[in-house]
Amino acid sequence: MTPVRRRKLFILLFALSVLSAAAALVLYALRQNISLFYTPTQIVAGEAPAKHHIRVGGMVEANSIVRAKKGLDVQFKITDFENTIVVTYSGILPDLFREGQGIVAEGEVTDNHHFHAIQVLAKHDANYMPPQVKSALADKVKQ
């Protein structure tokens, strides 16, 4: 092998090792900060890791919202129409949060049927209209 070829091979191997190290560091950082999404059925089946930051999504079950008499604690059930889990949350819920509404909760699984949320996000459809706009449009239609 000529010295020129040896030098090119050395540069190529060095570049590949630096690129591999950078990719490994990026993947390690993503693994630490990634928040995976699970359904209530997956949580009940034990597929979600316990004591690990995840997201769970589903519909708020009817007649399941229980608010504490004092404080901001709330407990409710979410379902994917196969299984149901109990979610506990301490904080102010979004304005769109209600029974029958789709939500995404971020937090940790405490056991196969309980989830402790640190953040609750209410999902809405693309046809959502604020109540003020809806009433204004209804008034215009009546005229």
From Swiss-Prot:
Membrane topology: Single-pass type II membrane protein
Keywords: Cell inner membrane, Cell membrane, Cytochrome c-type biogenesis, Heme, Iron, Membrane, Metal-binding, Signal-anchor, Transmembrane, Transmembrane helix
One of the GO BP terms on file: cytochrome complex assembly
One function term, GO molecular function aspect: heme binding
Domain of life of the native organism: Bacteria
Similarity annotation: Belongs to the CcmE/CycJ family.
Name of the featured protein: Cytochrome c-type biogenesis protein CcmE
Species of provenance: Legionella pneumophila
Lineage of origin: Bacteria, Pseudomonadati, Pseudomonadota, Gammaproteobacteria, Legionellales
